[in-house]
Amino acid sequence: MNRYTTIKQLGDGTYGSVLLGRSIESGELIAIKKMKRKFYSWEECMNLREVKSLKKLNHANIVKLKEVIRENDHLYFIFEYMKENLYQLIKERNKLFPESAIRNIMYQILQGLAFIHKHGFFHRDLKPENLLCMGPELVKIADFGLAREIRSRPPYTDYVSTRWYRAPEVLLRSTNYSSPIDIWAVGCIMAEVYTLRPLFPGASEIDTIFKICQVLGTPKKTDWPEGYQLSSAMNFLWPQCIPNNLKTLIPNASSEAIQLLRDLLQWDPKKRPTASQALRYPYFQIGHPLGIISKDSGKPQREVQDKTGPPPYIKPAPPAQAPAKAYTLISSRPSQASQPPQHSVHPYKGDVSRTEQLSHVQEGKPSPPFFPSLHNKNLQPKILASLEQKNGEIKPKSRRRWGLISRSTKGSDDWADLDDLDFSPSLTRIDVKNKKRQSDDTLCRFESVLDLKPSESVGTGTTVSTQASSQRRDTPTLQSSAKQHYLKHSRYLPGINIRNGVLPNPGKDFLPSNSWSSSGLSGKSSGTVSVVSKITSVGSGSASSSGLTGSYIPSFLKKEIGSVMQRVQLAPLAAPPPGYSSLKAVRPHPGRPFFHTQPRSTPGLIPRPPAAQPVHGRIDWSSKYPSRR
């Protein structure tokens, strides 16, 4: 020890203390670990696990044991000096680590751990204090005092590792554990590096199990039968907890990090990945092209594809969010090339990109820069036919120009990305056809509501809208059912005053449709009234596409109009009005309803007293529908 000088004490542990020293010959800083117990022979020293393991382990991410010195029955280990440990690095942080730094730290830990496990050892005491650092750029595993050989025989001691990083099989006093306990500790350390707080800070072993259950949820007996055997052996009752989403606990972690963390923290040690398997997770795959494959790299895949046949058709799962704009990928936007579409019509399972998949189907043809489905003549009719069956309508031929996008998922603003392309003529034709179809659909819907056309004839719209409208007609609300009931059993229906043979004339005194807003009616009822006014004006002799003539009395005069609650009186059947040309307009009185009518004076009936003013908001049904005599 006369070749080294001690500077200060760095720390004190269970089995020894660590001093900072310097080599007199080279001036290099070193860490001197002085064991507390005395050793009286070299054979006794060489039997130490730390010496046995570190003699065989030489790796960039494992702290290097430079020398072993026994002097005056005291044993000294000379290690390379590292500035700090991971616990100190976490404690000194006042903000979260960037994910690139965390990925670098975890990669080095798993690299060193894979080397340890490969050489037949497992650490048994992984924690941030035993991971020595030179900043976040360099991390090394240290303190192999509890390390054991994997091939050594159990039983092992059940108090190994610090409680917060102890695997559940060790917490349940298992004596038959192995290297997966190191993988569990790595998962706990990874979560702590992300959040700067321990994931399972239990005050005792049982409290630590409770903390684990609160995060991961109570394991099922089928998921980990050995754990239930261990718990029953120590009379431990599992707390009933539901799992928490790790993304909510660690919001700054990416989805790849959550995937790795979830697998590292599996209850069953057999389901945890090994350290070498964890290094192959997507979390550590950096710099690989996302969705962009060169021609050279695509050749072997194409040959394999030709031998094995085309990939199977996989039905896409419905997206959780609104479907993204599909096939708006344009060569002028290279930044979007790495993002696959979330709602594609024919996704295939695999690592090849969408462009290469289409090139396989096209038997080696070069893929187009955009809209790959334009050149796909074989798949296009089949997929379009299936889409037409799903949507229940026949698409215009010009719609095929945009390939495999269903009409139901295409919004009106989805063509914004195509402004710079020369598709204006076909777009104009499609807009005209769509407007015409929409106007026809609107007219058919109004005619079916007004009973000018049977409901089965509404077939030009989509099947969904037809079903929805028929469902609304078949299952009316309670309010509309009441109206239909009373209107069906009364002789007084809205729209006509039979005393003077009067029908409202929209050309003169009929109020505009927007005046219904003052009466509290919805926009739908006002639109219906405006349509009624149009059809009424048709009856006065103007030309109409619906083909109504002057002598035709439409059936909407016998039904309710929108949500209007007013009533009218029918003319006697013996003397019908000669025509609509002799009808006069009804001028609504201020403060009275629009379709106000006067009672018919019939000889032989007692004259009706004036109706009392109803309470505001209520309908006086007794005055509106008196009993028949």
UniProtKB/Swiss-Prot annotation:
Question: What keywords are annotated for this sequence in UniProt?
Answer: ATP-binding, Cell projection, Cilium biogenesis/degradation, Cytoplasm, Cytoskeleton, Developmental protein, Kinase, Magnesium, Metal-binding, Nucleotide-binding, Nucleus, Phosphoprotein, Serine/threonine-protein kinase, Transferase
**Record-listed E.C. numbers:** 2.7.11.1
The record places the active site at: 125 (proton acceptor)
* Protein name (record): Serine/threonine-protein kinase ICK
Instruction: Please note every region of biased composition (Basic and acidic residues).
Output: 296-306
Gene Ontology MF terms in the entry:
ATP binding; magnesium ion binding; protein serine kinase activity; protein serine/threonine kinase activity
Residues annotated as signal peptide: none
Identify which cofactors the protein needs according to its UniProt entry.
Mg(2+)
Q: Which organism is it from?
A: Mus musculus
List ligand-binding residues for ATP: 10-18, 33
Biological process according to GO: cilium assembly; intracellular signal transduction; intraciliary anterograde transport; intraciliary retrograde transport; intraciliary transport; protein phosphorylation; signal transduction
Instruction: Tell me how the protein is altered or processed after translation.
Output: Autophosphorylated on serine and threonine residues. Phosphorylation at Thr-157 by CDK7/Cak1p increases kinase activity.
Q: Where in the cell is it found?
A: Cytoplasm, Cytosol; Cell projection, Cilium; Nucleus; Cytoplasm, Cytoskeleton, Cilium basal body
In this chain the Protein kinase domain maps to 4-284
The text of the family note is: Belongs to the protein kinase superfamily. CMGC Ser/Thr protein kinase family. CDC2/CDKX subfamily.
Which residues does the record list as Phosphoserine (modified residue)?
A: 161
Q: Which gene encodes it?
A: Cilk1
